[in-house]
Amino acid sequence: MKKANIEFSRSFFYLVTLILILAVPGCGVKFIADYDEATDKSVTELQRKVEGFLVDIERKVGTDDAAYSNNTEFYDEVRVDISAIRVRAAAREKNEITLEQLDLVQKNLDNLEKLHELGFNSPEEIEPLRKAFNASFTAILKFELAKKRGEKI
């Protein structure tokens, strides 16, 4: 009887092991959120808005139209846009990387605003800010597109 129990236990163990070996590869463990078309589109729209603002300021440097006090509405609008994108991203599980990237966009906006308050003296001062924003936007969009393709990240 003991021998039969031992044989049954071994057979059961091997059967369970075989089932697990076959089942585990079929279980796709996800470490990041899925692609989100709304985030993709919102970030693209935000990039266009920021780029449009930078182009406008470049043209107006040295005029009253370029003064910070005449452009505070832009900063308010972009803060609302970033907040809306961030809330959506936070509502999705395993989306921490996108949230970190959005935090960098927010820091870039904070830096732009501080520099704008000090005043721009030449259009060349805008280019490093543009590069920082575009690097952040590109990172977010590349990450979303990689999710869309289902790449291992």
Predicted regions and their residues:
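Bacterial N-terminal signal peptides that target proteins for export
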Residues: 2-16
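C-terminal motif of bacterial Sec signal peptides marking the signal peptidase cleavage site
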Residues: 22-26
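Bacterial signal peptide processing site
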Residues: 28-31
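Alpha-helical segments in soluble extracytoplasmic regions
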Residues: 53-94
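Short, charged, amphipathic alpha-helical segments
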Residues: 65-76, 98-103, 124-131
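Structured, soluble extracytoplasmic/luminal domains of envelope-associated proteins
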Residues: 87-116
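C-terminal amphipathic alpha-helix
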Residues: 108-153
